[in-house]
């Protein structure tokens, strides 16, 4: 995941004071743990500091100063001074998220106040110019300068609310029989491997009620303060500010139209998965005409269904494309996994990670303090310091995540030469799509065979269906999930749902769109289940993950065409293709200097998001699902339970 002021990484160390720490890494990784987290923390930091994301099409007042030379001098000074402030803020935030102490939180609060004050002044100065006759870049950069902040007391309150939500999420443990479990790694492993419905329900309920109930009162304050801040800057509400990242007023209808085109594939996948869960858990748990129980669909949140692979594999007697056993047998280490990710990018002629990367990143979970484990990439805004924070384990899932996060960092390194206002992806979905693009190529059988993680085998349509099923569990299944996470929040920000009905409204929308229901009643007014996922409590929009899933297939199609791939898209690997790397670098180096359709056109020749590459990629699986579901007489869709 990308965070737009800095990125974040997995295992870092920092003492209770101000020193930066990293993770415990093997000697060959040369890490003493003194590093920042690179989750593309721009988003988190922007949230804390009321600095707009670089993509925002903020409404600004028209001034009277028509001197473009003076405007350019102002922008040059702003670029230098604000980059330095952002770097300082990134360091403070890194230290806090890799060591969740009150001391480190106080430092973030102090730096945030200075950044907010600078942003207010810079915004006022930028607004003094009449840009009507200015050149394109001067005009566009001025619209990205600073933003208006809440008053100091409210800004302090917002910063504290965000820190408290982060700390609750990062520190929460669930306990049973005097033993306590963290989300990473214990609960995550349980949800990935357990087929005990009772055990899974316990973990799901304890996590959602423990985190959701603690964060709920803070989230009410958060919605109020973020809305107030957004309106100060000319937006209708905070959801409007998020959507303007795409520089269009039509995003809501656009994403709904895109999903309608993919929905038939999703419903086929849903029906098939429901049948396999029925065979695993029985009729007392699974209704063959109803929604899926939330605690049984993959991870803690039902976001990724990848961990259902063994249950739903179409041809269980044929190989699955999960080389985790091979990685373990070959004594893979965290360091080796990151080295291979870096080498993948270099093979395309792209930039290697900086020499400081392994020293400064947190790549494994430390044992001596509480940290935020969610994998993130960080850009420290100095053009040199890029890091990852990740509590990595030796698994294929984490191997793919590494390539995803390194994709974020590659994007940041490619646009590091641009003025600060342009140092961002063309839109939020672009950044995420680039990360997934790398993981897509790495997951192919061709690539895994080339790096010795999969035995060479003859083409087998049944193995292909197994592969496509696994891919669908981590892409197609996420589309309605990510859509609902934000359509629900957009309604919150617009004030369309009474506060005491937030949770019920979420589950009604989720049941209707995703076909997933809570496993136990969720009508307690204390509950707020959506905030129990990192992105919601961490102030990240999630429509970026919806748009990225659409765009990653468009980008993959373009790169595969450029690299002269012959055959279906799902067999394409652009490893070692410098032609693909050159084309990709051209788009990445644009940053947000142009509207996103321009960036997309530079790589794909298209100016709109299209689901056709995704549908073409999964066409063999879609056809197989239609036949299999018809054979079993499956109901496509689901009945909403009366209690819903």
Model-based region annotation:
Residues 1-44:
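Classical eukaryotic N-terminal signal peptides for Sec-dependent ER targeting/secretion
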Residues 45-48, 55-221, 239, 248, ...:
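N-terminal helix-rich structural modules
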Residues 62-71, 102-103, 137, 237, ...:
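C-terminal, non-catalytic "cap/extension" segments appended to globular domains
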Residues 179-193, 199-202, 220-389, 456-477, ...:
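Active-site-proximal, well-structured secondary-structure segments within enzyme catalytic domains
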Residues 240-245, 249-253, 272, 276, ...:
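Inter-helical turn/loop segments and adjacent helix faces that build the functional surface
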Residues 392:
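Ligand-binding pocket scaffold of soluble enzyme catalytic domains
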Residues 412-437:
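Post-HEXXH active-site segment of zinc metalloproteases
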Residues 432-458, 468-469:
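Conserved catalytic alpha/beta cores of large enzymes that bind or transform nucleotide phosphates
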